[in-house]
Amino acid sequence: MNEKYAALKSNVSMLGRLLGNTIQDAHGDVILEKVETIRKLSKSARAGNKADRDSLVEEIKNLPNEQLTPVARAFNQFLNLTNMAEQYHTISRHCEEHVCEPDVLQSLFSKLNQNDISKLDAAQAVRDLNIELVLTAHPTEITRRTMINKLVKINECLSKLELSDLSHKERAKTERRLEQLIAQGWHSDVIRQQRPTPLDEAKWGFAVVENSLWEAVPDFLREMDGRLKGYLGEGLPIDARPVHFSSWMGGDRDGNPFVTHTITKEVLRLSRWKAADLYLGDVNELITELSMTKCNDAVRELAGDEHEAYRAILKSLRTLLNNTLEVLDAKLHDAEVPKKETLQNIDQLWTPLYACYQSLHECGMGVIADGSLLDTLRRLKAFGVHLVRLDVRQESTRHSDVLSELTRYLGIGDYDQWSEQDKVAFLTNELSSKRPLLPRDWEPSEQVKEVLDTCKVVAAQPREAFGAYVISMARTASDVLAVHLLLQECGCPYRMDVCPLFETLDDLNNSEAVMKQLMSIDLYRGFIQNHQMVMIGYSDSAKDAGVMSAGWAQYDAMDKLVKACEEEGIELTLFHGRGGTVGRGGAPAHAALLSQPPKSLKGGLRVTEQGEMIRFKLGLPDVAVNSFNLYASAILEANLLPPPEPKQEWRDLMEVLSEVSCEAYRNVVRGEEKFVPYFRQATPELELGKLPLGSRPAKRNPNGGVESLRAIPWIFSWSQNRLVLPAWLGAGEAIQYSVDQGHQALLEEMCREWPFFSTRLGMLEMVYSKCNMEIAKYYDQRLVDEELLPLGELLREQLQKDIKAVLNVENNENLMQSDPWGLESIRLRNIYVEPLNMLQAELLYRTRKCETPPAELEEALMVTIAGIAAGMRNTG
């Protein structure tokens, strides 16, 4: 590996050596030697040695069944350890400047100065900063919580070993601890034995808050406060809340029959329980710290005659939090609920704690106030009483089914058969009616009752418990009005953000018309109180039309929505449903935000952070602080130095690129009759269904083809065999078509001057670097029927042409020239991913030959799936 990355290289080889010791202890020399042979052959084969590639294939074909699991596990574990070493490297003191972006805020302030942005405008933009990260469980984090906890501890050991003044004894002790952790990981299950329930997923989300975000939020705000004081002369207001969190875990019922209203209610209780538990930890720490006796009158009044006034106040808060835990425990376990005062709103903690904070400052103890107490006050604003706010997500047809069943019962026709105009008229009429719509004696079907019960759960909770009610597959104005009506009928006393999610290509293109229609309804304007949230779907649009076409539809929809809302004087928050992979809208955060349409971040940023990306971006406190800094600086830059409006000729060419790429994509995915059988044979798509990943089924409709597959398994399957087809198909072909039409110079100009376009091509380069045509070809040779082989050949040829087309327009000779660290990171893992790919192809070959494959083969296959996901740094 490049000498630039010496510290990382050294950590990777140390972890590899310790893993080798563990394998030797557990399985003796035979397995270790096999692993070493495969690793060396793979490295040599990657460098182009044909003889060693043939030897590698033979070596893997000749492995007996009982050796497959330990060999696969060795590479799987090594990739997890490599990921950990790399993640640690980005926050370590040895980190190179071009890797760590040492201070994104500092470089932003320099840019603002160069562009003569006034301090007044900058201060206002900071006050308006609103980053809401929405934690979602799908695509599910493939690494088990057990393993993640061990990886966090490994990170702590690496941090210790970095200290140069560590004594020989301390170093040996830390290395021994590392070896123990690696051994614990080796002897634990890599794969979950059962699918997680929605409750398990929610607990995983709370664990991320407890282990990382709880510490990261005050750290980030402290750092930002210091930066702002240096640049603006004023810090962050004490009640600033630039970053906060919502969650879909336990609220997302779209296509997940296991998320019921009962589950949602339980997750809300668990969320409050965890918040009270974490605040209790803070309060206990403050009791030990705030032993001072000098205080102002306000604190004296709160504390009464107690000598240690601060402690007296804190002890009363401790009682309140203990009561809250006791009451919630009783509710969670269906026990008798004690009648005690509990924490209902944040002011119960904020008011007394803020009084203590002011008193300490007034009494000359500001340095104490600005320690743990300030951290707790910052947390109160970020996490509230509920820790994370819960989104409810439901598919649009589930709401129209309720109204259809109801109107038939009332004898006024079938809502589903009405025109859109009639639906809107009916809904607006009912929304303004004073009489209830739901008859008392009506007994709805089970499915309809479930939707209404969910709305009742929303109505029974305070507004702060929820983020938004998201309507997936939203297509029309009536889809949005229907949810407002159902919430109203179920007694919801407050305005809920009802957020349409536009997912397919057609729905994105139609989103402006739908929102304009809604905004033209006076009653609706009253409901939304001049604030509208709209969610842009990335995964389904890419699956529907390919990445190039979907990317342009998303940009164009956002641009039109921003302008439409601005004309109407409505504040718009765009909610981005990005995935972890490019085929689902994933991109490096900073670049992705700066490539959005002008003014699209004025209403703040709301974005989903998906399963495995939560761990990579938010899993350690220091890494999370880096992520917050990237988000904050990108939003401030986008709002203070907005990108130029794209030229009309750029837009026109994007329309052409979009059309050509969509056609090229659909010609293969929908038009090629052999495509679905090829997909099923060349990837582990069918086997993926057995993996106990998330709580939701892999298909919306178990009998359908590609269109019924969820976006996640669709992409996951292709990233396993290294063709990564959905993340590039159609894009390069469209670019080459435009070059052939004489648009080379215009494409080069777009590349230089338009962040949207250059980011698209940068994402394609990253995908191309992760593809491996040799591996994809090997899967075909081992697994695919002869009559389907020409299709695989055709796709690989197309990929080669596409890479040339993109490099030509960028005037680059090699992929990822401008991101050497990203390329190095992919290379580092490739040496270990490729043996797993070869093993997986062999395992698929063996399991598909058996009616009932032996358990050891199935286990080994699951291990390769998890390992390749870790190596590709994404699931789907």
Curated annotation (Swiss-Prot):
Catalytic residues (positions): H138, K543
Q: What does this protein do?
A: Forms oxaloacetate, a four-carbon dicarboxylic acid source for the tricarboxylic acid cycle.
Q: What is this protein's name? A: Phosphoenolpyruvate carboxylase
- Catalytic activity entry: oxaloacetate + phosphate = phosphoenolpyruvate + hydrogencarbonate
Q: Which UniProt keywords apply?
A: Carbon dioxide fixation, Lyase, Magnesium
The record's similarity note reads: Belongs to the PEPCase type 1 family.
**Which EC number(s) does the record attach to this protein?**
4.1.1.31
Short name of one Pfam family: PEPcase
The record's top EC class is lyase
Per the record, the GO terms for biological process are: carbon fixation; oxaloacetate metabolic process; tricarboxylic acid cycle
Entry GO terms, CC = cytosol
Keyword Magnesium (UniProt): yes
